[in-house]
Amino acid sequence: MPASPLRFIRQDIQSMHAYAIQASDGMVKLDAMENPFTLPAALQAALGQRLGAVAVNRYPGQRIEDLKQALAQHIDLPPGYALMLGNGSDELIALLAMACDMPGATILAPEPGFVMYAMSARLQGLNFVGVPLAANFALDEAAMQAAIALHQPALVYLAYPNNPTANLWDAQVMRRLIAQVGAYGGLVVVDEAYQPFSSGTWLDEIRRDLSAHSHVFLMRTLSKF
């Protein structure tokens, strides 16, 4: 009898479930933060013509640096910060988990939150700690502080606004948690994938106090631009 083709696949990976997308028939679909409108016909034609002239058969070379420079100008990137681009937030989240893959390392996030925080940690063999939100969907500051003190996570995710609860965290609580993580050398990711739905951005806070955010990544997405 031949050996199982799954023998070298970790058991915890085999026990995981696929990332499921719920049907949205008859609903106003906002959960994926997609642009509900198609491009105007004139823009479609111009875009097709422009893309048709791009040497897609070659690696991007300098084009990636040109794109980074344009994006940095667009968002008025604070001094001392740099941009890292990925194929959607999922790739960046996975790369961060890989970068933090040290024995006993932990990734922490409030829950409910974006499923990929936990999934990327588990795929990489890291510990994941989810901290339940308060009854009003606010951050449970005491529980977050206790979990951070206990586990000293390499990486803490704070979605701003949160997905799926749609709220912005209290700024004072955010500042205290960011400072707590920075005190032992941990990293914080402020995930602003849904920022276009929001009245605020943590980028303003970063600009206001750069020194307090030297260990903070701010993540956004163009997948729904």
Indicate residue ranges for each PLM-predicted region.
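N-terminal small-domain helix-loop-helix segment of the aminotransferase-like
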Residues: 2-90, 95
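Hydrophobic/aromatic beta-strand patches that form the interior of the parallel beta-sheet core
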Residues: 28-30, 108, 129, 189, ...
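Short glycine-rich anion-binding loops that position phosphate/pyrophosphate groups of nucleotides
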Residues: 33-36, 89-90, 114, 160-165, ...
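Short, well-ordered alpha-helices that flank and scaffold nucleotide-derived cofactor binding pockets
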Residues: 45, 49, 73, 98, ...
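Short acidic capping loops at alpha-helix termini that bridge into adjacent secondary structure
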Residues: 79-83, 104-106, 192, 214-215
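Glycine/small-residue-rich loop that forms an oxyanion/phosphate-binding "nest" at active or ligand-binding sites
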Residues: 88-99, 190-194, 198-199
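PLP-dependent aminotransferase-like
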Residues: 99-158
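Active-site pre-lysine segment of PLP-dependent enzymes
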Residues: 122, 139-151, 164-188, 192-225
